[in-house]
Amino acid sequence: MDRVYEIPEEPNVVPISSLEEDVIRGPNPRFTFPFSILFSTFLYCGEAASALYMVRIYRKNNETFWMTYTFSFFMFSSIMVQLTLIFVHRDLAKDRPLSLFMHLILLGPVIRCLEAMIKYLTLWKKEGQEEPYVSLTRKKMLIAGQEVLIEWEVGHSIRTLAMHRNAYKRMSQIQAFLGSVPQLTYQLYVSLISAEVPLGRAVLMAFSLISVTYGATLCNMLAIQIKYDDYKIRLGPLEVLCITVWRTLEITSRLVILVLFSATLKLKAVPFLVLNFLIILFEPWVKFWRSGAQMPNNIEKNFSRVGTLVVLISVTILYAGINFSCWSAMQLKLADRDLVDKGQNWGHMGLHYSVRLVENVIMVLVFKYFGVKVLLNYCHSLIAVQLIIAYLISIGVMLLFFQYLHPLRSLFTNNVVDYLHCICCRRPRPERVENSETSCEADTTQSIV
């Protein structure tokens, strides 16, 4: 994931005096090329083009059923992507007819990408010049094991470019879990029952798989940023690689199991899958109603109660879509302004993976014993074992990340080993000592990443 700015190591920053706490003055932020925006736009255009191509092929072959579902998944995710970009950029309150028209014809990500490129070129030409409009941003940072508070100036142009990046991160998650996941699952199902994989369908499945993996990786990064909003977080290549491997194994094994289960039971599998999704969808609302809390009214200052309700419903649908295929890396909390529980939530993570593992084992057993007509030329037992092993490996890689590679693992009250000791050895969890300086709060916690 590319960064908007970078903070150098401790010797390059200058401490300044403060009556309340020591603040280190950071250098002027350095902007980088927005690769993530280009990549997200490429995935959107590639998946859209391949989906429309398959719709044309299905229509030509009079396969109306397959054509309808392929087009429906494409349209739903595309509309949600346009609404996400409009919401983040607040276009409804601005006079921007060209942007709204491009969103209307489902080309909003393309025009937004061009705007971001123009903004980057403008910054590149003005590099070294001071901007007249700047704001101060403060973040905590761990340097050599010590927690320090860093302050730096952020120009208006860099903040605008950062807003584009944030919008595309959220767009990629919407596209991944509300469009690519159902599209990939359905195309796998069609390939399985038709016993053929034409080039167009293979390209569509490839774009969908890359989109899902990228969206899940971003989901982890955004979860870390939201939970530790006061901290400047760095994720190195090894951490990103670990997250990508974890998510790829988790999602592919889960989706293949769902496809084999659906191909085995046909329509009989629909009630199980729908019930599974509805439980995830209504679980945050049940907790919200049981808590007796009021609906948050400060999500967006210009929103009415109806607008707030629409946002909450949309977020809940996205949350359910993520948890249906993989772990969301955060727990939804509708009564909170940030809509997420910022605790570590080891229990929530353990419950999710335990339930999903049991579900996967049950679906694999159904495929093994009843899927005689699905894959006649393959050993069902070998396929079942490989899928379960792949899912277990993904859990192992996830535990490895939280134990050794999490950027702020030193702030954990308990880590993975503590919980394994508690569960396996039946011993009380040893409480790790928190950093004594974590109570130091920044005056300004506005985040631009």
Curated annotation (Swiss-Prot):
Membrane topology type, per the record?
A: Multi-pass membrane protein
Q: Name one Pfam family in it.
A: XK-related
- Any transmembrane segments, and where? 35-55, 68-88, 98-118, 174-194, 204-224, 241-261, 269-289, 306-326, 357-377, 382-402
Q: Where is it localised?
A: Membrane
Q: Which UniProt keywords apply?
A: Membrane, Transmembrane, Transmembrane helix
Q: What is its main location?
A: membrane
In its keyword annotation, does this UniProt entry include Transmembrane helix? yes
Return the GO cellular component terms, semicolon-separated.
Answer: plasma membrane
- Hey, which family's this protein in? Belongs to the XK family.
Give the matching PANTHER family. Answer: MEMBRANE TRANSPORT PROTEIN XK FAMILY MEMBER (PTHR14297), XK-RELATED PROTEIN 2 (PTHR14297:SF4)
What this protein is called in its record is XK-related protein 2
What is the source species? Mus musculus
Query: Gene symbol?
Result: Xkrx
